[in-house]
Amino acid sequence: MSERIVINPEVCGGRPIVAGTRVRVADILAMLAGGASEAEVLVDFPYLKAEDVRASLAYALQAVDHSIVQAAA
């Protein structure tokens, strides 16, 4: 995990957030998936930086990019 993305069990139900905020990584990803640009995300969350958006994407990539292990038949 990057310094920009943190998990605190006492904030936002323990979901990943941008450090120092209550903005969930999922909120940023939902906006991007819905067609918003990085610039539009930053307009909606003016206290974020472009690096926070990129860190959210990197976090999502790390979460889905894992080795697939198959059990022997």
Regions found by a protein language model. Name each.
Residues 1-13:
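Basic, low-complexity segments
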Residues 24-73:
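Long, charge-rich, low-complexity alpha-helical segments
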